[in-house]
Amino acid sequence: MKKSICFSILLCALSACSSSDDDNTRDMVYPEILSESIVANPTDCQVYQRGDVIPFNYVFKDDTELGAYNIEIHNNFDHHTHGTSSVECPMEAKKEPVSPWIYNRDYAIPAGQRTYTARIDIAIPTDVDPGDYHFMIRLTDRAGWQQLKAMAIKVE
């Protein structure tokens, strides 16, 4: 009797740990930042003027569901790299920032989207240091997978 009670408890415990989820339906794929079939903007080596606008335009895609995206712009006065582009742009001499442009914003993507076209006008402040900058896009899908795209741009 003791053996059957212990066996029953063990069987119940193991059953509670099992899952009916099908592992084949789990999202295991990174989202994509696409520039094909649109006029993607910005792209590597583009030059912008202080006081102008960067017309951001990219397509995001995921096999299951998109989540959100982030745009970050920061100076590259020290010539660091993020390693997502093979394009080399002409760079100014290294320098110390005085009034660098720092932009970092999160954007929601409506629920249930597998493809989304992101278009935003980003105003460049008139009082920022001119020079080399990185424009970074971080795209996250609903499962938490993230894709990064970094481009070198210049502000004059």
What positions do the PLM features span?
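Aromatic sugar-binding surface patches on proteins
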Residues: 99-121
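Sec-dependent N-terminal signal peptides
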Residues: 4-14
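Short beta-strand segments of immunoglobulin-like
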Residues: 40-48
